[in-house]
Amino acid sequence: MGLPQSDVVTLPVDPVQSIPTYDAALAAFNQLPHVRLLFDSGAGASPTGSSNPGDPYPGYERSFSSLPIPGTNARTWYFGPHGVLTNTPPASGGINWFSSNAHALPLTDYGTNTGTGGLWGNASQWQWKWLQSPSGTAVSYVSAPLMANTTVIGSGAVDLWVRSSTPDVDLQATISEVRPDGNETFVQNGWLRASERKLSTNSNNMFKRLSTALEPIPTFTAADASPMPAGQFVKVVVPLYYEGHAYRVGSRIRVTIAAPNGTQPVWSFSQTTPNPSGVASIAFSQSMPSSLVLPVVPGVSAPTPFPRCPSLRNEPCRPYRAIVNNTAQ
């Protein structure tokens, strides 16, 4: 697990490991739910009751029969004026833009100690450096405070209407939770090179399944790669990696669009475009509805309070700071 020897960790009892025969162990394993989700990893207590923020224990867990979770809804929030996310496409459209520069932030968001301990220890050893994007290098959109706990399980997407000053542009989407206490928690990322925006229309793709609103699948073939048209907006869907996160009542959901880098602890993209920089514009309107789509699972409660900041493993938190988006006519 990469834990330092100074961190005393007691693992929970394995329900299968102590069964003496293979057949009996297999039968017991097959009786377990197929999907087990550990929420708020780092915010829980050990089997002995001890609790140190960042230790590898979940705040709570839930089990399900399959993934995607039955009953999952594709919940859409639309980009709007003044950096808001709304429930419907905005009545009045607009354009925001940012300078696309993959070196606007440090390439990674952690300190130098990423081996045993440090990143993998408890929160007292962390050296997160998750920084806010410099002015003009990102655009951001934030929802209204949530009226109920909103549990998101699975992949998602950010549907963007993009215009680029260069023939190609790399896009990074960052999803975070803006808490009522003024802190912001990182949740997940997604990336796409805009020239590779063509989505698969059948199951003949790398995942061998159909592309959906919650799991868009680019073809990633050379034949389908296409430069960005000069002076025109085109739809670019950025797939999001999986998340299992409860956005608690009163929190706001934030999506930030920027060039890649600055949001992962130990790796970054060494080859990015444009190089060194360009201008990416994002449109939002009735006819060009840029949006965030997340897989919301109804009826999944969050029985614990907000986790301490910091405490979640590989989900750094920081004081929230609003971004004033650049606007264009």
Enumerate the predicted regions with their spans.
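C-terminal, loop-rich substrate-recognition/catalytic regions characterized by aromatic stacking residues
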Residues: M1-Q329
